[in-house]
Amino acid sequence: MAELQQLQQLQEFDIPTGREALRGNHSALLRVANYCEDNYLQATDKRKALEETMAFTTQALASVAYQVGNLAGHTLRMLDLQGAALRQVEAKMSTLGQMVNMHMEKVARREIGTLATVVRLPSNQKVIPPESLPSLTPYHRKPLNFACLDDIGHGVKDLSTQLSRTGTLSRKSIKAPATPVSATLGRPPRIPEPVQLPAVPDGKLSAASSASSLASAGSAEGASGIPQSKGQVAPATPPPPPVAPVTPPPPPLSAEVFLPPPPLEVSQPPLEAELPLPPPPALEGDELGLLPPPPPGFGPDEPSWVPASYLEKVVTLYPYTRQKDNELSFSEGTVICVTRRYSDGWCEGVSSEGTGFFPGNYVEPSC
């Protein structure tokens, strides 16, 4: 407490008083200097005036030196007291830190001891029955109801297999018969008619069979329209009958009605004599497409700047101007021998310009 009171007295009284005394001596010394100058100029005895001036000067210097020394001593004393106070605060903070560390170590040891404790469960609590069992609903047998499936799917019957057995052209064939085939009943061969989409009731063709019949009919007509050669004249195909709104079901099969034979392959018209291709025009010596020269550094002889060992050769895609002294500057198409790669994307290599670093996304491997 005494040190704190002394420090407070120095800061509030002694040091400000010494500073005010120095300011007062400054103004007093100015007045003494003016007096001595006037006295020396007006005095008849210059020797006596000079001695008087020297005495005033000695007294003023002694007074100023005393006041400066006193103020400096007070300032040093204040600094010493402040250093001692700071050391006390530092010691207290160190003590508090040690206490906190000790407390944390105690807590950690307590937790470690808690985790290391063996928990032994009593042997009589292996199975704990529930407090109340849920009530079970008695089973009642219910008949199956298939009416819930009425709105699922569609009820259209597929008769595509039956149509394939009743004289319809094969769906996989795209060829037409070369000669007309006479039917058993004396009528011209029947051209398959395009089938329209039937209604929903049973006994009609499905959408899939109708689409396939249309595709087969169109393919048969397209195949029959191939032009014949001059030596072979195919008979004209009769026009198809008008399309009925709804195609009637096919007639029932009997022993007297036979299916027409499968259509024969239509002979392709002989191709005209192929003329030989004209020879390519003769190229002059200056019109020959010579290969472009390889980039520098890819000749049979390696340049002198290529190092003895390197990872690979790369070609620059874009020009780059170095930002630091240890980087490379290059233009587009420059060949660089990579000697080292870094994880940040930069590479180190050697080019005809020198050795340095360059960004790895400016180059691509050479072919």
UniProtKB/Swiss-Prot annotation:
Q: Where in the cell is it found?
A: Cytoplasm
**What Gene3D superfamilies does the database record attribute to this sequence?**
6.10.140.1620, SH3 Domains
Q: What CDD domains does this protein map onto?
A: SH3_Abi
SH3 domain boundaries: 309-367
Q: Record's PROSITE patterns?
A: SH3
**Bridged cysteine pairs (disulfide):** none
Tell me which Gene Ontology terms the entry assigns under biological process.
actin cytoskeleton organization; defense response to tumor cell; modification of postsynaptic actin cytoskeleton; negative regulation of lamellipodium assembly; negative regulation of protein localization to plasma membrane; positive regulation of cellular senescence; regulation of cell migration; regulation of dendritic spine morphogenesis
Q: What ranges does the record list as Pro residues composition bias?
A: 236-264
Question: Which InterPro entries does the annotation name?
Answer: ABI, ABI3_SH3, Abl-interactor_HHR_dom, SH3-like_dom_sf, SH3_domain
Q: Which residues carry this modification: Phosphoserine?
A: 216, 219, 343
**Keyword ATP-binding recorded:** no
UniProt signal peptide: none
Residue ranges, annotated region (Disordered): 163-273
What residue spans carry the Low complexity bias annotation? 206-225
Family matches, as Pfam families: Abi_HHR (PF07815), SH3_9 (PF14604)
As recorded in UniProt, coiled-coil segments are: 36-64
List UniProt keywords, sorted A-Z: Coiled coil, Cytoplasm, Phosphoprotein, SH3 domain
Per the record's keyword annotation, is Coiled coil included, yes or no?
yes
SMART domains in alphabetical order: SH3
What the record says about family reads: Belongs to the ABI family.
Q: What does this protein do?
A: Inhibits ectopic tumor cell metastasis of SRD cells. In vitro, reduces cell motility.
Tell me the subunit arrangement.
May interact with PAK1 and PAK2. Probably interacts with TARSH.
Q: How is this protein named in the record?
A: ABI gene family member 3
